[in-house]
């Protein structure tokens, strides 16, 4: 069995799951903020947000990192001599920080201390898309 391809497949599955959450959670925040007067809807959004963040996004982020580190180990540390890998890691670290920021937003919505507008959440919803596009092009083309 080719373990490299196995771990690469698992890494990609984890990345896709993580990205789905990073793209969807801010959209739920938009609906949450736009329906603050509807208590029943807010309770549903809180459940959706919590489950998405803790049961899909967090495990997907952890397994993305885990399988990514395993792939680096299999490839050998000399992969760090390539600039594209440094850029990719920087972008993945940025996505991780963004993920944690969404966790802060989740908590502020839960505690009713949120000061962000639905427009804000619509705008930050584009961040992971741009980063994903950059990562894909960097990994496929390895331009530098």
What do the PLM-derived regions correspond to, one by one?
Residues 1-144:
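Polytopic transmembrane helical bundles with strong interfacial aromatic enrichment
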